[in-house]
Amino acid sequence: MSPPQKPPKLRHACNECHASKVRCSGERTGCRRCVYNQQKCTYSVSMVGKVQGHRRRAAVTGTAPRSGAQSLNINTSTEIISVANADVIHDEANGNDLNSKPNDVPVESSEGITSSPAHCSILPGGNNGKVTTSSAPENFSTSLESIDTSSLETPIIEHEFSWDFSSDERADALNSLALENPSNVDSMKNPEYGDFEYDFSIHEVPATSSSQDDSRSPKRQIADPIPISPVPKFYPSRKRTHSDLSEKQAQHAQNDLRWRSQSQSYKRPTISTQHHNHSFSREMYEYPESSASFDADCSFDRGSTSHSTTSQTNMNHQSMNRIPQTTQSNRISFTAQSHYMVSSMSSSVTHYEASWRFTSKCFIIISKLQKLLRDSSSLSLDVILATNKSAISELAQMFDSTLASNTARSTSPEDFFSIHSEIQPSNTCDTSLSTDFIPLMVYMIALKCIHDLYSQACFIFTQDDHRSRSLSTPSPRNTPSTSNSPFSNPFGLPQLDFGTFKIDIADQRRLFSEIIARELGNCLSACTRLRSYFLMQPGDISTSTGLIEEMFLGIEEGLQSMIKRVKI
């Protein structure tokens, strides 16, 4: 009795995929390509390990080459049956004849074909006894080509990269970017999620956070699909609402208005008056004309526009810088007259704003003047004098532009200030000695600064050692640096020089005298114009106005004496 015939081994790819030379999915009920193209899916018997042609068939079966195709037709519309119900149909005509052509075996299920290596070859049946060692190509059970790798080469299908979503969930997952984070993770407290107002939580789960969400990875979560949130999670605590913005804007506007109305003077750099007074007190008294009248402007330091050390100027500027008055103990020239200006601190904020708008440019000019004149890098006399001339010109031009066309020359400071600021004096406050004198004091301090700086220049010029200016000795003026100069200036004003070109010392003295006299004349004319514009008629001079005029007259007298001294 012959052993039962084993089912034949079929190809891994169907005929259509094999002809097109594309990868076949390998479903015995019909591959995906044939199902998609609505083609008939047929699988031929595998010829692996067999010699194709009539010689092998003649050697094995002893018959002529068979006619007909060795194929297995599979209808995709047939019903799928289980492995146990898969029957091998034998040909009734040649049921007992093993030498006839192989029987066609229809396979209706993918599990109906065993992929064991023991069944990779088709045994010839009754001719097993005739097989010798020369028929070794028949047994390829251990060959890699004979192994059916259909179970290992499963193609990538849709349900593998869409995880374990249902049909509805898969569409939402592929079309939405807003995956909600796991319910047991609070994104407000978990640093693994971003600090954005809208947390979409599309993050890789790190290995260190296994205590909370180690089982939430899509690759490991098979049974429970990840929930999907169609709307991004919104955290109201991170979003600035309109009411918060409005409240902050209102608060900012209120603070800005308060700052502008009360603290605008903080824009200017301030230096402690006490510290500044100590730094220049020893240096000022080294000059013949640096007496108490020179103390009024000594507080302007290298670009700084801090107020004067005088008590009178300090009280006039106290409404601008809002700092405590700490200079009452300083012994200066105007201490005895400071009680006349006590009422100037009772001005309103409106007057302060207008006066600051009027005097801000003056402080800028004075700051620039002080920075250039006291800078040790200014080694040329022409640079210093040009700076002074431009400062005086700007002050005079600004003063002329502020006066109205219908303003008389005898206009009082109160009327002039009201016309300029376009604000009429209030009846409820005393404007006779208020901040109306602030512009006048600023102009006076600017001219006082220029006067004293020229006084220093004249002192250096007149007290210069004639032995160092002999014809046999090179003049220190022609030296570009001040390191070789025999005379050091502790105040900061450099040794005067006409530049790098050489000039005779006699010509230097003559040019020096002419330039100084001309510039001092400009200062004198500007000071006279200021006094005539601001001050009233001599018969109507009040006590405080008389003090201002007295200071102007002192400056003019000093300028006239300096002009006489520098003339040769």
UniProtKB/Swiss-Prot annotation:
It is found in: Nucleus. Residues 92-114, 207-278, 467-490 are annotated as: Disordered. Residues 242-259 have a biased composition (Basic and acidic residues). GO terms for molecular function: DNA binding; DNA-binding transcription factor activity, RNA polymerase II-specific; zinc ion binding. Transcription factor that probably regulates the gene clusters that mediates the biosynthesis of botcinin acid and its botcinin derivatives, acetate-derived polyketides that contribute to virulence when combined with the sesquiterpene botrydial. Botcinin acid and its derivatives have been shown to induce chlorosis and necrosis during host plant infection, but also have antifungal activities. This is C6 finger domain transcription factor BOA13. It comes from the Eukaryota. InterPro entries: Zn2-C6_fun-type_DNA-bd_sf, Zn2Cys6_DnaBD. Gene3D superfamilies: Zn(2)-C6 fungal-type DNA-binding domain.
